């Protein structure tokens, strides 16, 4: 791994993290039990990475600098698996089973569909 790759991942991760912070701050303001911001961030990340993979495959572009910037950096900073699991832990602890099932389903099912949508758009 060279220094340029590290910079690309660092910059993309910073932007993705700031966007996730902003989404979460404004979308979770009035919600008590459903962490909408994490879901929105994860779904956007799934869509972006689906688009990116399909675009690179369609035009046979080598996965280098911009790919690192967007997929590893931006999507890595934007999406948040650890927060997702922590949210599920709190829902289980507080016995919010219906919310837990909804949250789990939204993130996994819609996440998969958003990746597929991104791929279909660029195929």
Model-assigned labels for residue ranges:
Residues 1-123:
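Membrane-interface helix-loop junctions in multi-pass transporters/channels
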């Amino acid at each position: 791994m060279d220094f340029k790759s590290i910079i690309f991942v660092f910059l993309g991760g910073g932007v993705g993290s700031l966007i996730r912070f902003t989404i979460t701050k404004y979308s979770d303001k009035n919600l008590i039990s459903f962490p909408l911001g994490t879901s929105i961030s994860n779904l956007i990340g799934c869509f972006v990475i689906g688009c990116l993979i399909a675009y690179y495959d369609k035009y046979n572009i080598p996965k280098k600098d911009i790919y690192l910037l967007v997929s590893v950096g931006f999507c890595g900073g934007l999406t948040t698996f650890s927060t997702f699991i922590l949210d599920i832990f709190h829902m289980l602890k507080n016995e919010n089973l219906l919310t837990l099932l909804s949250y789990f389903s939204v993130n996994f099912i819609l996440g998969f569909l958003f990746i597929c949508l991104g791929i279909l758009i660029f195929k």
